Structure formats: C-alpha cells, structure tokens
C-alpha cells in the first residue's frame, strides 16, 4: 500500500467534511544504495545491493559472482560456510525534517531469518524478538530519525528446527538459506493517528450482477497522549464518505464502515473482477485517510476488486470454487520463486502472462511466495486466480531439521505462536487481492488442532474468503474435510491413466499437485547448464538437475525407460530431446484434458509445477530461462476455452466449454494412418453449455484399420464455419497398461508400453514455409505439400546471435499438419530485431530457417 499525499475528499455522511486537508509526507521505500558484507570481513570492501535481496541474490545479480554456478554440478561445490556467520546490510538516507506532531515508523516486510537492527547507532530491535521470515515488524523511530541517517541490519541465517522460506525438493537448498532482507523496507509517516491494514471487502448480487456492497475496514492507532476526534474518509469512483471516529489516548481500534453507514459503499452496476477466461479482471482504487483538525493524519491507497468467492462440494465430497456465482474449474500450476529470490517485477508479469497464454486460470502458491506484493498484483491485473498457503517444508524433518509427527514439525507453544502470528501478518498483508480465492492452512499434513484453532480465530476476525485445512484429502476435527487430494502421480504416467477409475490420481476431484515428471527444455536452454562434454549420453550432469527427492525423481531413468519402451530408444541427443518433448506434450495434455472431460466430478487440477527455481529438467511449463517446454503448448491447446478432446479411456470425443456462455458448434474429426491414408472423416453438432463436457462420438474402434499408429485431427467450428480450436493426437494400436497393485506415491508402475516405434520410419514430409510481418505480428504460413502427415513441427524465434527471443507468444506450436493442409501461425514477440529468424523443424520435416 502506498501513501496518497493530496486527498480532496467530500463527506458522504455527517455534517462535516474532509475537504482540502493539509497533505502529509509520502512514505519512503528504502531500496537503493545498500551495502552488504560478512561479519568477519567488515573491514574489507563491501558488496553493493538493492533491497529486497538475499545475500546470494546480491552476490550473483549485482556483483557478478558465481557466473557458472548452475552449470553441471558446480552448485554442489559452493562454499556454504561463508553463510554460517551473520551478514550486515547497511544504507544511508536523508529524510525531511519531521513536522510538529508527525511520527515515523521503520517497517520490515520480511527478513530471513533473524535480525539485529540499529538506526543512527541506536539499537531498535534484537534478534531475540525479530525472527521468522513471515513476520512483519514495525518500529516507532520518531525519536531516533534525523535528516541524515544510517541504518544497519545484522541478519542471521536459518538454523535447524526453525521455520524458513519453503523450498522443498524441486531445487537444491539455497546456499545462504535465503538469508537477508528479502522484502521491502519502509519509512511510514503519520500524525497522531495512523492507519494499519486498510481493507475493502465486497458482496455481490450474483444473479443480476447489478449491485454490490462494500465494507471498508482499518485499524486506527492514536499514538498521542490525548483524545483525538476525526474522520475515517474514503474516496473512489462511486463517491466519497467520511465516518466520525474518536480515539482515546493510546487507543488502537479496528473500525468497519458498511453501506448502512456510508451509502456510497452500495455500488450500482459494479465493474466485476473475473478470472480471465470468464471476463475482465476489473479493478478499483480507494483512497483511505484519517483526517483530524484539517490535516491528513495518515492515508493509504487500496487497490481492490469487486467479486464474490465461495466454494462447494460435489457428490463425491470434493471441493470446488464459485466466482461471482459461476462454478470455475481450476486449471493451474504450482509456483516457486527463484532459488535466490531474484524475481523482478518484469519477470513476474511475464510468468503470469504465460499462465494466461496457456489458458490456465490459477497459480498455487505453496508458500506465501514473493519478494513483494507484485506477483499478486499481477494476478489481480491479469485475471489469474491464486491459492495461497504454507509449504510442506515445515511438515517434514528433512527440510525443517526438527522431528515431525502426523501434524508436521510445528509442535511447541512457541512454534504455534510464531506461525499463527505469521499467518495473521500474511493475510493482513495480502487480503485486498481479489485474485486470492483460498487460504491453505497446510500442505501435506493437517496442522496441529491448537494451531488450526488459532488460524480459524484469526480468519473470523480479519478475512472471509474460503479456507481449507490442507491440500490433501484429510478431515479436520475443527474445520471439516479439506475436499482435495494429493495422491500424485509426480512421474510419467500413460495418457489413459488419467481416465482410469483404478488410478489413484484419476481426473476426479481437486488434485492440488500432480505432474508427469521430466519436462525437458529445448536444446538452446539445455546447453546453458549441461557441460558440452556431458551432453551425450544423458548422465549424471542431467540427473543433478532433476529433483532432490530421496525416494525417486532424482534421475532421468523413468524418462529413459519411456523413450526406450515406447519409441525404441534414441540415437543421439536431438532424437532424445524430440522424444522427451513428445512424451511431455501428450502426457501433460492428457492430465489437464481428463479433468475437463470429467466435470463436474473433477473440480480442479494443479500441474506440478509451473516454473523452476533454477535450471531444471523436471516439473516446469517453461524453463528457468523463460522458454516454454513442449507441455506449455499442449496445455495451451488442451485448455482452449472451447475444445474437442480425445478420451483415451473410452475412445470417444468430448466437447468442452469453459466460458460463461452456452455455445453450439460443429465438431469434425479426420484420422490418418502412418502412410497418410485417410481412415475416417466424421462430424457432429456439439451443443456446449457453459462449464460442460459433452460426449460426442466414438473414434475408430481400437485397432480397427490402424497400422501401428493413427493421427487424429480435430477441429471445432462455429456456425459460420470458422475454426475455433484445433487438437491433434497420435495414437498407438495398443494402449499402455499399468499394474494398479504397484502404486507408490510418485507413480503406478507401467507393465506394458504402447508402441510408437513406427514413428521412426515416418516418411519425410515436404513443408513450404513463408513469413510475413503485419502490425508487429509475425505470421508464418506452413503448407504440407506431401501425402503424409507433417508431424510435431516446432517453430523457434531467434535473434541474430541464435539466442531465443523471449517472450514469443505463438498462437500454436509443436503442430501437426494433415496431408495437403495449410496453417498460419502468429507470434507476438518482445522484439523483432534485425537479423532475427524463425527456425522451422519437425519430426519428419527438414530444418528450414526463415530470415527477416
């Protein structure tokens, strides 16, 4: 929240007004000009830093150290002893002289893990009290501040048994254990009365959407030794209000203003906040101030959305979510911050844009991630839902360094006090974000009942959105069933797995984390972190960049097995990569699509994961270099608002509709053999109610007329014949088969693999490719001039040096073209520089470079 220094507010109630108050001093963000150094080296040259940053974040990003840290296994050799001792952060800054009656607080939004703090040589906080990364602290420094100031912060890293930022098994532990000032530092100004934690809540008429009711809430603190009378004022586009408040000397009180007290809080024809696939994410801003004696004592700008979120349970007991009266199928993925918490605002904006581009609508934050509120601001702006809660990091001894029982590691009264206060701080910090639709009390395990009761008491006091006890399927004695599930898998499973009633991870209910394991980056990314002499064969350097899980998932053996059994192995690195990409493409798409087919039995799916904290080969829709994986493009296709989907379980086509309007369309299917022979040409009308899945017709009976493999081409057309969406599949004569008795938490064993080895003999296709640029949009036309399918054609936009241009938002990628088919693909890119080119290549298509 930021100060607003000139409010001109006309009272909507009462006989007095807030007009033309004297402005106040703006808050100051202390971000630039910091220096850091280890305690034992304070007499040496200090490193420059910008806050927020961890120690490793500053050493790498701002001082150029450890440039090859992520190459091969180099990270294993980093000297971690240098972070065993405390590090100092220091900065100098100037401030305007305080006005009469003015007060100033020094606020820290997040430090890991402990800190001693001095301002102008006077200690204002001790590490015995200032600890816990998710606590937020504010200190009155009115009597210490000067016009020129020096701030020194001594930070101590996490120690075993403490509750730190929650990286788990998707990357190695941060070398510095995230030690540092990882969230903003502020100077906050006010007069006698300060405003804390202002919030705007909304209720909505979810039938006609023509009116909403707002409640404004703020905690007011009178720091003076006398009674203060004034007005809590608000101004937004619907009008203004002024609510009289009198505070006794030293009093702190939470004030709530409702439409009964301020009629302007009853909003007619509101602009609603929707997730992007249902509408526009409309936002409002409200200036909230406390005015006394004609002066603004304190003020904040609050951004908020008018929306109403709720939940429901289907017949099988699984939870789903309702936004503005509409049931929403959650389609999302799990977030992680960078390993050294170096996420820039620009990177956050792009990553959320990727979620939107994939036609997903949700991010799960298994941790209250973010070095500021920016990532949640982006979710608000771009219409992406957010599920926010604690990480399983605190539930297992291997990560926390403290024994766990069935409630995890948070066990003592001191632990419960720290975590419950952290819960309060984080919810107060984030509760104005309309994108956040649920708080998670835990991840893998239930929280201890005494801790959960604290959570529930806090929520009853400060927030009203849905809460679930954890991300699994357990039932709490206090809050009831979680209504979700976390049974995996986390490793590759055959596409039909998701449709099988026997599968633990079948596409029923709300699966809060699941994925197919290895999601291989493209060659251009791979060579940045795998040493050249270790690129082939795939070995230890690759395995080091999988996961740190102890039981499984720590090597590429499963992917190698799939490629060997389904494709007959790989002849070289490029062959391995394309087969890894196809494995990712069809496996990830099937996981998402099965949940769309199975609504309303399915209520949500979270792909594990969205992104990576470092260069990785596992669990990612795009890599650490922000280049999409093959799964990105299959999810983009599978999540198209209206789509045709092939059900691997019953061999039928389904029409699905995720938008908020009913539609009627025409479904078409063509099937081709390996030799390009047309096996089937069928069509049907598809009536597609909002939020529905409609069974259409059977594909060729399994095995009938299929010679090794069959290619399916599906199109959905509107009543004017315009293609709304496309989907392409390659199907083997016989499906993979699982042994359902051999279940482990990461996968169910596959006993028989589908045979796609015939793809190795697919005849060469002749593709004519051309390129034009119209209104800064790149258009590439692909014409298949051959009599066979042009399979798995990939387009890459590169600069003159051969580097991938990021971002490059293609309309589609990894496409297949039927014999004689022509497709036009478009691309919106961050830039189209001179010398750039598009590389076109495919499974059976020769590489062609289209130069600008």
Locate predicted features.
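Extended carbohydrate-recognition surfaces in non-catalytic/accessory domains of CAZymes
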Residues: 22-107, 165-181, 313-314, 545-580, ...
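Carbohydrate-binding surfaces of carbohydrate-active enzymes
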Residues: 218-219, 223-225, 539-813, 817-827, ...
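An acidic-aromatic loop/edge-strand motif
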Residues: 30, 50, 69, 77, ...
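Substrate-binding/catalytic cleft of secreted carbohydrate-active enzymes
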Residues: 362-551, 579, 583, 587, ...
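Extended acidic/polar, glycine-enriched regions
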Residues: 143-148, 217-313
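Accessory beta-strand-rich segments of carbohydrate-active enzymes
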Residues: 26-28, 37-39, 84-195, 223-224, ...
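Glycine/proline-rich low-complexity spacer/linker segments in large multi-domain proteins
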Residues: 124-126, 146, 150-189, 267-288, ...
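Active-site-adjacent substrate/metal-binding segments within catalytic domains
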Residues: 65-94, 99-108, 113-119, 125-128, ...
């Amino acid at each position: 929240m930021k100060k607003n220094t000139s409010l001109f507010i006309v009272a909507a109630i009462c006989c007095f007004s807030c007009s033309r108050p004297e402005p106040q001093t703006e808050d100051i963000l202390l971000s630039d000009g910091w220096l850091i150094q280890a305690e034992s080296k304070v007499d040496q040259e200090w490193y420059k830093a910008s806050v927020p940053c961890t120690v490793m974040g500053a050493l790498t990003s701002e001082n150029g150290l450890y440039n090859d840290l992520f190459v091969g296994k180099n990270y294993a050799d980093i000297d971690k002893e240098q972070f065993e001792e405390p590090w100092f952060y220091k900065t100098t800054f100037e401030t305007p002289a305080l006005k009469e009656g003015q007060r100033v607080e020094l606020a820290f939004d997040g430090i890991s893990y402990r800190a001693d703090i001095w301002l102008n040589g006077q200690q204002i906080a001790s590490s015995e009290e200032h600890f816990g990364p998710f606590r937020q602290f504010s200190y009155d420094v009115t009597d210490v501040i000067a016009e020129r100031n020096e701030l020194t912060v001594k930070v101590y890293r996490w120690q075993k048994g403490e509750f730190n930022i929650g990286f788990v098994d998707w990357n190695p532990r941060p070398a510095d254990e995230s030690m540092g000032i990882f969230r903003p530092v502020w100077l906050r100004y006010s007069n006698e009365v300060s405003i804390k934690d202002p919030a705007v809540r909304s209720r909505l008429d979810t039938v006609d959407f023509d009116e909403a009711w707002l409640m404004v809430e703020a905690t007011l603190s009178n720091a003076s030794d006398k009674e203060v009378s004034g007005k809590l004022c608000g101004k937004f586009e619907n009008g203004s209000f002024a609510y009289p408040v009198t505070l006794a000397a030293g009093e702190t009180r939470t004030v709530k203003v409702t439409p009964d007290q301020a009629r302007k809080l009853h909003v007619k024809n509101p602009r609603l906040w929707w997730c992007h696939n249902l509408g526009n994410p409309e936002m409002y801003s409200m200036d909230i101030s406390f005015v006394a004696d004609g002066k603004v004592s304190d003020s904040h700008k609050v951004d908020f959305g008018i929306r109403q979120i709720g939940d429901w349970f289907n017949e099988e007991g699984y939870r789903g979510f309702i936004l503005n009266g509409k049931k929403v199928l959650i389609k999302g993925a799990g977030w992680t911050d960078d390993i050294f918490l170096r996420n820039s605002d620009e990177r956050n904006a792009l990553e959320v844009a990727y979620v939107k581009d994939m036609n997903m609508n949700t991010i799960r934050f298994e941790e209250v991630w973010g070095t500021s509120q920016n990532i949640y601001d982006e979710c608000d702006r771009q219409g992406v839902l957010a599920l926010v809660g604690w990480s399983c990091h605190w539930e297992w001894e291997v990560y926390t360094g403290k024994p766990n029982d069935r409630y995890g590691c948070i066990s003592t009264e001191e632990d419960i006090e720290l975590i419950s206060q952290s819960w309060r701080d984080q919810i107060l910090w984030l509760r104005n974000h309309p994108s956040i639709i649920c708080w998670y009390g835990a991840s893998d395990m239930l929280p201890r009942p005494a801790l959960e009761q604290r959570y529930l008491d806090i929520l009853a006091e400060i927030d009203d959105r849905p809460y679930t006890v954890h991300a699994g399927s357990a039932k709490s004695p206090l809050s009831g069933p979680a209504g979700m599930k976390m049974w995996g898998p986390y490793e590759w499973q055959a596409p039909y797995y998701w449709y099988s009633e026997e599968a633990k991870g079948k596409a029923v209910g709300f699966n809060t984390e699941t994925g197919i394991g290895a999601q291989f980056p493209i060659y251009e990314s791979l060579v940045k972190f795998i040493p050249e002499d270790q690129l082939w064969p795939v070995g230890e350097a690759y395995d080091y960049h999988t996961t740190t899980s102890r039981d499984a998932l720590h090597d590429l053996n499963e992917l190698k097995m799939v490629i060997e059994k389904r494709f007959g192995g790989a002849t070289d690195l490029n062959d391995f990569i394309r087969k890894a990409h196809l494995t990712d493409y069809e496996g990830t798409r099937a996981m998402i699509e099965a949940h769309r087919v199975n609504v309303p039995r399915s209520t949500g799916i979270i792909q594990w994961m969205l992104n990576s904290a470092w260069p990785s080969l596992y669990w990612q829709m795009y890599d650490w270099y922000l280049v999409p994986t093959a799964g990105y493009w299959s999810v983009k296709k599978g999540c198209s608002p209206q789509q045709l989907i092939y059900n691997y379980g019953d061999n039928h086509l389904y029409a699905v509709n995720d938008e908020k309007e009913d539609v009627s369309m025409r479904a078409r299917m063509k099937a081709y053999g390996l030799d390009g022979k047309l096996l089937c040409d069928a069509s049907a009308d598809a009536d597609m109610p909002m939020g529905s899945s409609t069974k259409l017709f059977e594909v060729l009976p399994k095995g009938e007329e299929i010679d090794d493999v069959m290619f399916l081409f599906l199109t959905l057309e509107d009543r004017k014949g315009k293609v709304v969406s496309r989907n392409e599949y390659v199907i083997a004569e016989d499906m993979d088969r699982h042994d359902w008795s051999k279940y482990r938490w990461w996968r169910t064993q596959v006993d028989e693999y589908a045979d796609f080895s015939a793809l190795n003999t697919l005849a060469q296709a002749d593709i004519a490719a051309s390129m034009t640029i119209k209104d800064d949009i790149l258009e590439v036309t692909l014409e298949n001039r051959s009599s066979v399918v042009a399979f798995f054609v990939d387009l890459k936009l590169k600069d003159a040096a051969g580097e991938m241009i990021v971002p490059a938002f293609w309309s589609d990628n990894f496409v297949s073209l039927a014999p004689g088919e022509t497709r036009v693909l478009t691309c919106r890119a961050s830039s189209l520089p001179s010398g750039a080119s598009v590389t076109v290549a495919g499974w059976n298509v020769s590489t062609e470079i289209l130069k600008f």
